């Protein structure tokens, strides 16, 4: 083997060793869109007024919603229970590839749903599709952040004519210590 060939082999082996010895890339960090979800983290007392509808009895109800930040800070897990509404478990995340917020949930009465969300100033708007008993229902949830510890919400169901009918309106509050 010539000295040129020997030098080439040594250089190739050296560069290969360097490439293999490099540390793996650092895991991604949550971006500003993910950080917006942190608003919801904490234990909330939710007071809702259910309007007359064909799904749940009308009336006032009080429940709790506990939201926790998932490992890595990329999503928020949510558990809502108490009152007349079914217990629900779900999560909200920001899909940085599709550039949209997403939500998924399931309830104690077999209702499952998926939605996409946008945030504009202090207002979150979620377009959801609920599935229950073989039917698909489109809806819209609007959340308006009033302060770091208070928000209002409204769930509306598509009426089939291009409009929406309000099903639930409410407000939520949390103590500062719950954050």
Task: Pin down the residues of each PLM region.
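N-terminal secretory signal peptides that target proteins for export/translocation
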Residues: 1-4
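Hydrophobic small-molecule pocket/channel-lining residues, especially in calycin-type beta-barrels
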Residues: 22-179
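Bacterial N-terminal signal peptides
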Residues: 8-18
